């Protein structure tokens, strides 16, 4: 089965949240690794916000604090980069449990930002019987 999730966010929305709440906002939403990867670039933070939303949609759940009590925590979905700089997803906690429940074998992620918008698309594949263990 194929699962998809997509999200788009105005970079200015994330910029305003950072200006208003500062490190409190950043630490609530993003992991230390995500923050380090963004080097303070609001566009990169916005793309990772969109990635978290896209993956949550792919999993069929919301983000806790956005999508209600049944959602996953922001830190349960981490949007990082592999050794070649390609976007990758690390799941933990409730997000990891939901992916296993769905039999997801892999998640692919694409991020972009331009003209004040950031977008992410996540695609996951599952099989009827798990072929291998996920890295998370």
Swiss-Prot record:
The keyword Hydrolase does not apply. GO terms for biological process: fatty acid biosynthetic process. Mg(2+) binds at residues 7, 53. It catalyses: apo-[ACP] + CoA = holo-[ACP] + adenosine 3',5'-bisphosphate + H(+). Its cofactor is Mg(2+). It is found in: Cytoplasm. Its main location: cytoplasm. GO terms for molecular function: holo-[acyl-carrier-protein] synthase activity; magnesium ion binding. Pfam families: ACPS. Keywords: Cytoplasm, Fatty acid biosynthesis, Fatty acid metabolism, Lipid biosynthesis, Lipid metabolism, Magnesium, Metal-binding, Transferase. Its EC number is 2.7.8.7. The keyword Transferase applies. InterPro entries: 4-PPantetheinyl_Trfase_dom, 4-PPantetheinyl_Trfase_dom_sf, ACPS, Ppantetheine-prot_Trfase_dom. One of its GO terms (cellular component) is cytoplasm. Transfers the 4'-phosphopantetheine moiety from coenzyme A to a Ser of acyl-carrier-protein. NCBIfam families: acpS, pantethn_trn. Belongs to the P-Pant transferase superfamily. AcpS family. HAMAP family: AcpS. This is Holo-[acyl-carrier-protein] synthase. The lineage of its organism: Bacteria, Bacillati, Chloroflexota, Chloroflexia, Chloroflexales.
């Amino acid at each position: 089965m194929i699962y998809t999730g997509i999200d788009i966010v105005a970079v200015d929305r994330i910029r305003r949240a950072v200006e208003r709440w500062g490190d409190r906002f950043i630490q609530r939403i993003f992991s230390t690794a995500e923050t380090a990867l963004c080097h303070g670039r609001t566009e990169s933070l916005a793309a990772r916000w969109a990635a978290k939303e896209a993956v949550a949609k792919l999993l069929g759940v919301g983000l806790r604090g956005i999508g209600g009590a049944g959602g996953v925590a922001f830190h349960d979905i981490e949007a990082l980069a592999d050794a070649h700089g390609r976007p990758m997803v690390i799941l933990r906690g409730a997000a990891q449990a939901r992916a296993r429940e769905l039999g997801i074998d892999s998640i692919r992620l694409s991020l972009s930002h331009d003209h004040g918008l950031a977008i992410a698309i996540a695609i996951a594949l599952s099989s009827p019987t798990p072929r291998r263990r996920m890295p998370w």
